[in-house]
Design a protein with these regions (language model features):
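Short acidic, glycine/proline-enriched helix-loop-strand junctions
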Residues: 62, 67-81, 93-95, 124-137
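Metal-dependent nucleic-acid phosphoesterase active-site entry motif
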Residues: 1-18
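Acidic, PIN/NYN-like endoribonuclease modules and their adjacent C-terminal/linker elements
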Residues: 1, 106-107, 111-137
């Protein structure tokens, strides 16, 4: 399993994004089963659809949201049960500036995905327990 971050998914779905080419390569590997099933946190779904609506339009955001929710390669992870753990991770971070959603990603990656995350967020690289875009070189 691997946790998917909004920077990866937005990079893939927004052809104008600076990370589009790299995200497309990673997506090919993900869809080929390199890391197994992807974990899509509720918080990340909210980020993706909001950003795509603002940067593109509502129809793009809605279409991508539906693709993500219907994808057999993804497991949707509701975040209500993760809230207390995420508060701890967020509040006790040192040497990083993880957003609340990123703190949830870090927690889930550690507990369910052997620390693996698909992301272009440099803050994750500061955490030794995480592996960002594993074997992507």
């Amino acid at each position: 399993m691997i946790v998917l971050d909004s920077s990866f998914l937005i990079g893939f779905y927004n052809e104008r994004d600076a990370h589009h080419a790299a995200a497309s390569t990673l997506m090919d590997r993900f869809l080929a089963g390199t890391w197994g099933k992807g974990l899509l946190l509720e918080y990340i779904f909210l980020e993706i659809t909001t950003v795509l609506m603002l940067r593109r339009d509502l129809s793009v955001a809605t279409r991508v949201g539906r693709i993500l929710l219907d994808a057999e390669e993804l497991e949707f992870v509701p975040c209500s049960d993760l809230f207390s753990q995420t508060i701890e991770t967020f509040s006790n971070q040192a040497g990083t500036r993880l957003s609340f959603a990123d703190a949830a990603i870090a927690s889930v990656a550690r507990s369910r995905a052997d620390g693996q995350i698909l992301s272009f967020d440099e803050e994750f690289k500061k955490l030794a327990s995480l592996r960002i875009n594993p074997d992507s070189t």
